[in-house]
Amino acid sequence: MKNEKLSQRLTQVGEFVPQDAILLDVGSDHAYLPIHLVKTGRINKAIAGEVVKGPYESTVANVQSAGLQDQISVRLANGLAAFEPTTDGVNTITIAGMGGHLIAEILEDGRDKLCQVSTLILQPNNGERHLRTWLQAHDFTISDEKILAENDKIYEIIVAHPGQSVDRLT
């Protein structure tokens, strides 16, 4: 991995990942986040999912370069198709750097795989309201969030948990 310095945005996303989580990083983009989390001892196992072959190959190369192929599995797959709930044990999912509409679509398309997942850490670049509406409609509770500025952009990080529905606001 050429650049060992994680962006402030991804560092903040990583701080929400529970200790010893089994992580699926959707749209992993070079596996910077899972590599950082394994190297710092926050997690021991991760899946880095990529849907496009070029970024997938870069992700594979970075994981191999870091010597973490036993701890980080790189998979060429669309969204939540990158993991199997019954065998992979994923309990935390990160999706960062995409639009809120796309993140909601990824979650909707893989909704049947979310039953064992306890934590979603989502960082939409836009469409935050749409994503929040999807989370509320599917009985996810937002337990934490953070807004940060980096490179003249404002980013929002949303942490949500399933099955903890609260009264809806009108």
Annotated model-derived regions:
Residues 12-19, 83-87, 112:
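Glycine-rich helix-loop-beta junction characteristic of Rossmann-like nucleotide cofactor-binding loops
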Residues 41-42, 64-70, 112-115:
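Short helix-capping segments at alpha-helix termini
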Residues 30-43:
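Conserved SAM-binding loop of SAM-dependent methyltransferases across substrates and taxa
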Residues 45-50:
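Conserved SAM-binding motif I beta-strand of class I
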Residues 20-29:
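Conserved class I S-adenosyl-L-methionine
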Residues 2-6, 91-92, 101-170:
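Class I S-adenosyl-L-methionine
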Residues 1-20, 35, 53, 57-87:
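S-adenosyl-L-methionine
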